[in-house]
């Protein structure tokens, strides 16, 4: 199961339901981790506009508050590649938009 460390601001926004998409820059580190976990070809799925929809199975992940023991669990129902300009990252580069569903804090 993938673990996404988050800053407190983003952790709280996801927890409240205000934020439903987590963004990660399209770099070899995240491409490798995502392609292994979600079983896709990282070299074929690498252009803005590409969409990977989880039709039959939603993948579980953990969203952790920094490097503490506090975390939430969520399901990923879609990953797409978008321009990061209008995202939390605010960069003019391709980014993974990881769509979250069924977010629950684990106590």
Model-identified regions with their sequence ranges:
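Short structural boundary motif marking the start of a folded domain
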Residues: 1-2
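Structured alpha/beta reader/binder surfaces that contact nucleic acids or chromatin modification marks
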Residues: 5-107
């Amino acid at each position: 199961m993938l673990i996404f460390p988050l800053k407190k601001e983003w952790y709280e926004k996801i927890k409240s339901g205000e934020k439903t998409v987590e963004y990660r820059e399209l770099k070899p580190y995240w491409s490798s981790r995502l392609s292994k976990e979600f079983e896709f070809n990282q070299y074929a799925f690498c252009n803005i506009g590409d969409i990977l929809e989880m039709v039959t199975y939603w993948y579980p992940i953990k969203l952790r508050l920094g490097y503490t023991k506090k975390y939430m669990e969520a399901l990923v129902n879609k990953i797409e590649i978008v321009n990061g300009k209008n995202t939390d990252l605010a960069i003019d580069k391709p980014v993974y938009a990881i769509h979250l569903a069924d977010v629950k804090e684990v106590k």
